[in-house]
Amino acid sequence: MDKFVGKRLDGRYEIEEIVGVGGMSVVYKAHDEIDDRTVAVKILKEELLQNEEFRRFKNESKAIAVMDHPNIVKVYDVGFGDRVQYIVEEYIDGITLKEYIERQGVLPWKDALYFTTQILRALQHAHDKGIVHRDIKPQNIMLLQDGTIKVTDFGIARFARSEQRTVTDKAIGSVHYISPEQAKGEAT
């Protein structure tokens, strides 16, 4: 049994179940007792609390917090305590674009165009706010039942207008989707 399921986080978020596990965090479905709504609570994995990579988790909350777009998941709250760090987001009742493609096989061109248009509008909004996602892939795109797309997981996003450039000896991104420049660890 997970240590958060069945517990209340910060006296407000009643954690109901795990809905996803990523490299940096575990995502839970929860009930916000104050605003009386279902939310997603993304909790940083305990082993990463003191890790330098934790900076990515903070980047995600900062990146999403400045955006307000119907095709980008909304952030409602963040918490950065010593023992638990989390982001509270809009709960997306849907499936990933990857799951959808696996079920459907080849997408009809009209669906592909409709989804791509929404994704591009979301990315344009992010770019207008000075944010580069850097990990766009079908697993980071959610599809609602009504066909609405939501771009998620800004964990390795960076602010494009910042003075600091990302140049390290590490590749940033998902191996099947990163550009050759990212794979070489060059500036992005």
Task: Please identify what each model-predicted range represents.
Residues 16-22, 27:
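Protein kinase glycine-rich loop
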Residues 31-38:
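Conserved N-lobe loop of protein kinases adjacent to the ATP-binding glycine-rich P-loop
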Residues 45-66:
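AlphaC helix of the eukaryotic protein kinase fold
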Residues 78:
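Activation-segment/catalytic-loop signature of the eukaryotic protein kinase fold
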